[in-house]
């Protein structure tokens, strides 16, 4: 009997040794298919005071308690931003309700000279109710940009028809308010639909 028990334990250990790497590979494959890169450890985000699309104060502390997807852009953006928002609208419509309830999309302007709260509110209303827009002074915005790993180059102009160079990636922030990873462009909606519920369930 002791020999039999030892054999059973050995077989169980062997089965786990084979299964765990397989699970890790499956998870990594899902992340790759979704163009998601999770950080090996959380990264703190500085406390900053911004303004939302309703002209109300919005502290980065407000990010706590819920998962957020954040990206930088601007309302006059001709390509990246409308594409990102359209795809995010589609993704939110495809996600399970329980995942959607835990997740919030936030557009942070890289063009505060033109993107007033009212401008952000009007712009976001074309996509999905509940999407948040943030603005603030350039120093605060650049600090947040650096903390999130989403660079943008401030425009030298403040009037007229000008563009702003910015990253097409999105940041994934956990309910503790820390940076957890990035969703890289181009967005892969099928992969995101599969992997986001797992991330939200497993990465508390």
From Swiss-Prot:
PANTHER family tied to this protein: ELECTRON TRANSPORT PROTIN SCO1/SENC FAMILY MEMBER, LINALOOL DEHYDRATASE_ISOMERASE DOMAIN-CONTAINING PROTEIN
GO MF, one annotated term: metal ion binding
A Pfam family of this chain: SCO1-SenC
Organism of provenance: Stutzerimonas stutzeri (Pseudomonas stutzeri)
Entry protein name: Putative copper-binding protein
Keyword line: Copper, Metal-binding
Record-listed Cu cation binding positions: 77, 81, 166
Top-level taxon: Bacteria
Family designation: Belongs to the SCO1/2 family.
